[in-house]
Amino acid sequence: WDSPIMSKQFSERAPFKFKKFKKNSGFKFDFHGRKLVMYVLYGPGGGEATISIDSQAPRKIRFFDGYCSYYRMMPILIFEGNDGRHIVEFKMSDSKIDKRSILLPSHQQDFDKNPKKYEPANGYACCLYIVQ
C-alpha cells in the first residue's frame, strides 16, 4: 500500500493503509460471498473507475461528489447478490471528470482558488469487506 500521506491522515479512523490507483491501474480478484463493500476516499484528487463483476455489464463509480473540496472516507457497495464465488475487476479510468460542475456551489469557490488540487484523477482504497 503506497499512499503514506492518506494513510496517516486517516489512521485514527482506519488503521489500514490506503492504496493509490492512478489512471489505467487496478486489480482483479475473486471472493466467495453475497456482498462486497470497499472503503475508499472521496476528495479533490478523486477520479472514476470501472468495476466489472462476473458477467454483468461494467459500471462506473466516482471517487468525487459535490462535497469533494476535502477528503473523506466512504463505503462503496461493490456487489450484492447470490452467495457464491464472484470475480471482480477494478480499473481506474483515463476519462476526465468536469469536477467544478459536480461540486456544490459552496465548494466551487475552493476549486476556483486551487484548481491544481483537483487535477489528479486517482482512486484510494483501503479495505474490502465480504459478507457471506
What are these regions (language model features)?
Residues 1-132:
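Glycan-recognition surfaces in beta-rich domains, encompassing non-catalytic CBMs
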